Amino acid sequence: MIKIRDLEYYNNLKLDIYLPDSDTFDLLIYFHGGGLESGGKEEIIPSSDYLVERNIAIISINYRLYPFAKYPDFILDAVKGVKWCIENINKYGECKDIYIGGTSAGAYITQMLCFNSYYYKKENIDPLKIKGYIHDAGQPTVHFNVLKENGIDSRRIIINEDAPLYYVGIEKEYPRMLFIVSTNDLENRYEQTMLMLRTLKHFNYDESKIELKVMEGKHCEYVSKVIDNESVFGKIIYEFIKEKEP
């Protein structure tokens, strides 16, 4: 595995690259969690060996965080990162397919990118370049810290232009998607994930492209877990990318 750390992709923001030895690979672009106020690109490290050994390259991207960010800075940073990946990945080998994944706050970002095409259009990115999305325990309603920024009780469940759910039904089709949530997730996260899935069904999106994985335990605790020398989260990602293709 080749590791390239702390490459600047935009305005002093950094990313890390993990490359397999092969010249041809799939790519996972990853956004970390942390409530839009903490965390970092190193979050993917427990899964990196598992994925790279199976010929999946990873680019893990930092983005601006509260209190230095305001909505939608983190989404604008994320799409800049995606653009950098699309424009530069073939310098490191032949990239077959590109997937975007995120955990918790990172999955709020992945859902905003997936469902609100404004961000891709702003950067002249063709959404069809993205083969699939991994939305790991992300909030499909307005993120609780975006509510807090606006002086609203962070427990409120609000769907407006700041929520991924608001945009479902606008596009005619979406790429494949994997949603992950836990049985003992954050308060209301399981129910909100189910609402997202039912909304996609309500608009008659191809259910064969939508997968749900419910994990036993607490919010995202599987992300760093290793069982029998295998990364639990890495295996979930691998199976979605490599073994579940229609």
What are these regions (language model features)?
Residues 42-59:
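Short amphipathic alpha-helix adjacent to the substrate-entry channel of hydrolases
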